[in-house]
Design a protein with these regions (language model features):
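Well-ordered, non-membrane alpha-helical segments in soluble/globular domains
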Residues: 62-72, 95-104, 135-145, 177-183, ...
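Active-site region of glycoside hydrolase catalytic domains
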Residues: 96-100, 104, 111-113, 123, ...
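Glycan-binding loop/region signatures in secreted carbohydrate-active enzymes
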Residues: 154-156, 160-228, 260-261, 265-272
Length: 276
């Protein structure tokens, strides 16, 4: 059985918070800038080891991507990074070309590349990132379909702690995102009966609003995050992206903390953690 790899997307200023964890930092410090060229944020915090996260927001699509790809490879070499995560939310042709070039360059050098699912068709060696947040269907089925499409050893799961309020019926399948504070406030006011969906690996409840009618609220907690990890493991997935802000209060539950740091708090079904 493959050993799990947890990549923790985290800003440079918070790196000390995951010291001692059984995980690798994914440095939220890079973006595609004009040129395109590789731009780095994070000030004077030294970055070493783990992987780099490259944000594609703000890139205008202009310029040849070859020099940029060489800059990424060079940065990995200088910083001792084992790879890179492409955090692209738009399918611009230059970004697709960039992903394809990095896929080949990284494979030649034994580096790991992780790309969002919409960019999966651009790569043949890299791992493809699926989101754990679903509003319908089955997480297990989604992982199986991805394994058939990309290969079982090329699928990674992004653990996204989500909470959404859906008006019923919901023809688009999209709800209103809730912060943890908003979710807790709503649950404190409604005191709803909370249920668990095995297919989605998420908790949910329903309520009626005098003005807007029936609502369905789907949300995650530490226990559902662990459930998603276990479902993914059974599907042969061993690489997880777990953003620090989403898992910081359930890192022990996920097995990321050394025993000396583990503290068992109340079950997440009984209380939604505060914080934003």
């Amino acid at each position: 059985m493959a050993t799990d790899i947890f990549l923790i997307p985290i800003p440079p200023q918070q790196l000390r918070n995951i010291q001692g964890w059984s995980a690798q930092p994914a440095h939220l410090a890079y973006r595609v800038g004009r040129g395109p060229h590789l731009f780095r944020a994070g000030g004077s915090v030294p970055l070493r080891g783990g992987v780099m996260v490259v944000d594609g927001q703000g890139y205008d699509g202009a310029g040849p991507v070859g020099p940029f790809c060489q800059e990424v490879v060079s940065e990995c070499s200088v910083r001792g990074f084992s790879g890179a995560v492409l955090d692209f939310d738009r399918r611009l042709p230059p970004l697709e070309q960039l992903a394809g070039q990095l896929d080949r360059l990284f494979a030649q050098r034994g580096l790991a590349l992780y790309v969002p699912e919409p960019f999966g068709h651009c790569v043949s060696h890299s791992r493809v990132i699926l989101s754990s947040a679903l509003s319908g269907g089955s997480l297990s089925q989604r992982l199986e379909e991805a394994a058939e499409r990309f290969g079982r050893d090329r699928v990674a799961l992004s653990l996204e702690r989500s909470a959404e309020d859906f008006s019923l019926p919901s023809p688009t399948g999209s709800g209103t995102p809730l912060t943890r504070q908003q979710l807790r406030k709503q649950m404190d006011a409604l005191r709803p009966s909370v249920f668990f969906s095995r297919e989605l690996c998420a908790r949910y409840y329903t309520y009626m609003d005098r003005d807007t009618g029936a609502h369905f609220v789907l949300f995650d907690d530490g226990d559902t995050m662990l459930c998603k990890v276990e479902v993914a493991r059974r599907a042969g997935v061993s690489v997880f992206l777990a953003p620090y802000e989403d898992i910081r209060d359930c890192a022990g539950l996920l097995g990321l903390l050394p025993r000396s740091m583990q503290k068992r708090g109340p079950r997440a079904v009984d209380a939604v953690p505060a914080g934003e």
